[in-house]
A protein has these predicted regions:
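Conserved short beta-strand edge segments in small beta-sheet-based binding/regulatory domains
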Residues: 160-165, 191-207
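Terminal, non-globular segments
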Residues: 173-180
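Hydrophobic side chains in well-ordered alpha-helices
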Residues: 35-38, 115, 149-152, 183-186
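Short amphipathic alpha-helix segments
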Residues: 140-158
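Structural motif
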Residues: 24-25, 54, 92-95, 136, ...
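Active-site beta-strand/loop microenvironment that shapes enzyme catalytic pockets
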Residues: 77-125
C-alpha cells in the first residue's frame, strides 16, 4: 500500500466570527457514498443552519476531490475548505462547515478566511496521522539474550509485541519497510550472529504527524 495522511479521528470544532457560528465536522471516510452520507446527515441534523458547506478527498493518491458552497457565493466556501485539506495532504476525509448566520455579512474575502480557517482549526485540534505499512520481524531468543533485548530495542526506539515465554522467548517487532535490512543487521551484530529472526506478515499502523 502507499502511505497517506488523514485525520487522527472524527471530530467537531466550533468558533464564532462576527456573530456567525462556524461548526466544522470532520470524518474519516473511504468511499464517495460514505462521504455523501456523512454530509447529508449533517445537513439533516442542521437543517436550520444558513449553510452546510462541504469538501472531501478520497483515495491513496487523492484522486477524488469534491466540494460544495451550499448557497454561499461561488468559490467562497467549498473550494477554500478543499484547499486546506490539500495543503495538509489529507485524504480519505470529509469536512462539513455549518454556518449559522449572525447578522453581519463577511464579504467574499471574509467568507473564504472563515471557511478555510474553520477547517484549519479543526485539523490542528483533531490531529493528523500517517497511515503506512510496517514489516514484522519475528525474533527467537534465549532467556539470557532476552535480558539484553530491552537495551537493543531502546537504542533503536522499538517496541516488542506478542512476546511468548516457552523453552525460548519468541517476540515481534515492527519497522518501516526501508528499515528492515539495517534493523536485521543491527540485531545480528548486537548478538554476534547468535540470534534467529525472520520477516513475517506486515501490519498497517497510524503514526501521529507532529
Amino acid at each position: 500500500m502507499k502511505e497517506f495522511k488523514t485525520i487522527k479521528e472524527d471530530g467537531i470544532v466550533e468558533e464564532e466570527i462576527k456573530k456567525s457560528r462556524f461548526i466544522c465536522f470532520m470524518k474519516r471516510v473511504t468511499t464517495e457514498e460514505e462521504a455523501r452520507e456523512f454530509i447529508n446527515g449533517i445537513k439533516k441534523e442542521h437543517y436550520k443552519a444558513s449553510h452546510n458547506c462541504s469538501a472531501f478527498i478520497l483515495g491513496e493518491n487523492m484522486e477524488i476531490k469534491r466540494s460544495s458552497d451550499d448557497g454561499e457565493p461561488s468559490g467562497t466556501a467549498g473550494v477554500p475548505m478543499l484547499t486546506v485539506l490539500e495543503n495538509h495532504e489529507l485524504t480519505n476525509v470529509a469536512a462539513v462547515v455549518t454556518r449559522y448566520f449572525g447578522g453581519i455579512k463577511l464579504g467574499a474575502g471574509g467568507l473564504i478566511r472563515a471557511y478555510a480557517g474553520a477547517v484549519s482549526k479543526a485539523v490542528k485540534e483533531i490531529g493528523v496521522v500517517e497511515v503506512k505499512e510496517q514489516k514484522g520481524i519475528s525474533i527467537t531468543l534465549s532467556y539470557a539474550q532476552y535480558q539484553e533485548f530491552a537495551n537493543w530495542r531502546a537504542e533503536l526506539g522499538l517496541e516488542e509485541y506478542d512476546t511468548q515465554f516457552t523453552t525460548e522467548v519468541q517476540t515481534m517487532i515492527y519497522v518501516d519497510k526501508e528499515l528492515v535490512a539495517p534493523t536485521l543487521t543491527s540485531l545480528t551484530e548486537f548478538y554476534h550472529g547468535k540470534v534467529t529472526s525472520q520477516e513475517t506478515e506486515p501490519r498497517i499502523v497510524e503514526v501521529p504527524v507532529h
